A protein has these predicted regions:
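ATP-dependent carboxylate-amine ligase
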Residues: 1-35, 62, 68, 260, ...
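Short, basic phosphate-binding NTP loop
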Residues: 2-104, 372-377
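Short, hydrophobic beta-strand segments that form beta-sheet elements in well-ordered domains
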Residues: 5, 25-30, 52-53, 67-70, ...
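Adenine nucleotide phosphate-binding catalytic loops in nucleotide-utilizing enzymes
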Residues: 6-8, 28, 192-195, 210, ...
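Residue-level detector of alpha-helix initiation sites
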Residues: 10, 109-113, 245
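Phosphate-binding loop of NTP-binding sites
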Residues: 18, 22, 61-63, 72, ...
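Active-site regions of enzymes building and remodeling cell-envelope glycoconjugates
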Residues: 41-54, 80-89, 100, 175-177, ...
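Short glycine-rich anion-binding loops that position phosphate/pyrophosphate groups of nucleotides
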Residues: 73-75, 163-165, 184-186, 216-217, ...
């Protein structure tokens, strides 16, 4: 079987890797001559089965394929529409997954934890469940999930849906139940406004059963006869933060809708542990540390509002993600004793310092470029409360693992 992959962002590269690992012949293309292919290059792939084209799309090769995977960012473009009209879209060819009871979890923050909670509850209730989704959120991409779901028998499929891929996922998957954790200020370069983002969510949940956050004023406005509300979980939970009580209650309400008993839900959540890269609390020598990805202002605020941290260590976003610089506006108000900046997704530390200077930030500010130097700095601190977060999940996870070891 010959499959084409159109677009080689994170999802496209993940799709290429997933297909090659399964022995498919793959043609992958992207019109951007300067596309970063580091994800593809670090994998041990069979290059003999990969026909890679950078700078253009060969439509003849694409339309002669047995199936075509399209990057979510291209889903509303003409090339995707043409592929769908020709009956070549991969989810229309490999479509067994559409018969599985499917739960989609979306929102600005809490998607990964809530998805894992639902998965954990269902698995511990005796069901066969497949979990996956958004390649930028710690999973191996939508295509990996689709392929897995078509290979074996499952009772349920749980998908983490990125807020920028709602239309794409609505087409690729036959979704039965949607959980929306919250609507916050992230990816505003795509959504343009919180009002427009809310409208996109409203369209996504249309005619479907949806579980919405009663603490989110934008989501409360979307209530209808098909919606259920969640609040804060009041059972035992071994996770840091009030925000995780909301995630747990979202999972509880979703699983009750699926027919899982309260007893099984409570029992499962008692044994649930933090997902790698998400917020965790630990003791390091005499210091109390909370660490986890908080790549937008709402996520950061949710953690920092829990308690006062003397030292805040945050990773920087990509060069083009200036919409995430508003994290610094909140940090100025929060005013930690010491702020450490490190290169998270890109080395935009200089841009962060310049932005803080414009804000008139006068507290102790340092730039530390290397993970080992961050560890060494933490070792000099005594009896401090430290938060490590911001952008750059892989580096945050690495720092956390070194502190635990």
């Amino acid at each position: 079987m010959h499959i084409s992959v159109v677009g080689l962002g994170v999802e496209g590269q993940q799709a290429t890797i997933s297909l090659l690992k399964r022995g498919y012949d793959v043609y992958s293309s992207d019109i951007n001559r300067h596309i970063d292919l580091s994800l593809l290059k670090k994998e041990n792939i069979n290059e003999e089965q990969l026909d890679l084209e950078i700078g253009s799309h060969n439509l003849d090769k694409i339309f002669k394929s047995d199936a075509v995977s399209v990057s979510p960012s291209l889903f509303n473009k003409d090339i995707a529409k043409n592929i769908i009209e020709r009956g070549l879209f991969i989810s229309d060819i490999l479509n067994k997954h559409k018969n599985i009871k499917t739960i989609a979890v979306t929102g600005t923050n809490g998607k990964t934890t809530t998805s894992h909670m639902i998965y954990h509850i269902l698995i511990n209730s005796g069901f066969n469940v497949v979990l996956g989704g958004n390649g930028g959120g710690g999973f191996s991409g939508y295509n990996e999930l689709l392929l897995k779901a078509n290979e074996e028998e499952y009772d349920y499929m749980v998908i983490e849906v990125c807020d920028m891929t709602l239309d794409f996922c609505n087409y690729v998957f036959d979704i039965d139940l949607i959980v929306v954790t919250n609507i916050g200020y992230d990816h505003m370069d795509v959504h343009q406004s919180i009002e427009h983002y809310t409208e996109e969510v409203e369209e996504f949940i249309k005619d479907k059963t949806a579980v919405l956050n009663s603490n989110d004023e934008n989501l409360v406005k979307l209530q209808n006869d098909n919606t259920l509300l969640f609040d804060k979980y009041d059972g035992k939970l071994n996770l840091f933060g009030k925000f995780n009580l909301q995630n747990a209650d979202a999972a509880r309400v979703a699983c009750r809708e699926l027919g899982v008993s309260n007893k099984n839900i409570q029992k499962a959540l008692e044994t649930f542990t933090s997902v790698e890269g998400r917020t965790i609390k630990l003791q390091y020598e005499s210091n109390e540390i909370v660490s986890g990805k908080t790549d937008n202002v709402d996520a950061l605020k949710a953690v920092l509002d829990e308690e006062y941290f003397d030292t805040v260590i945050i990773g920087t976003p990509r060069k083009h993600e200036t919409c995430r610089f508003n994290i610094l506006d909140y940090i100025k108000k929060y005013s930690p004793d010491t702020l450490i900046i490190f290169p998270g997704l890109d080395d935009t530390t200089y841009d962060y310092v310049q932005y803080l200077n414009k804000l008139g930030y006068h507290k102790d500010l340092r730039v530390i470029k290397h993970v080992d130097d961050i560890i060494k700095y933490i070792q000099t601190l005594k009896n401090k409360k430290i938060f490590i977060g911001g952008n750059g999940q892989s580096k945050i996870t690495l720092i956390t693992s070194k502190l635990i070891d």
